């Protein structure tokens, strides 16, 4: 299914996908498949606006989690693909962050189940960023981290990326 959807996207944008295909040949089979999943299901705006290396970081982190964390490996494929591997959370700028966040958080959640890890990641996020009201464009997760604050939606994008960076399936949900 991933390969089929990737080839369909590539057929629609041959000049964009030719260099992507060249770079995929240099990846391991697992990382190439993860990248193909991202490209198969990402919006055209992401394909056109971000370099391959950004998505490679998400793919490499996801594959590493799948290989090294038994809890992640036990996830149903659809959950892993959509809520751990996938790069997009909302309409935020996409920037490399997952590998960095995993390095920052990993030791704090060592040996924890998903529930315990989710709580610890939430504490880490609260330590790193606070609420700040603005009307600016939605920042990337790494920008919120570096700035130390963000709007409500930015904080949730930050938290979802932090959770996904360590293999905890997460998505953004709005509730009144």
Describe the residue ranges of each PLM region:
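N-terminal accessory/pre-domain segments preceding catalytic cores
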Residues: 1-122, 127, 134, 144, ...
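Hydrophobic/aromatic-rich core segments of domains that either
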Residues: 107, 117, 123, 132-142, ...
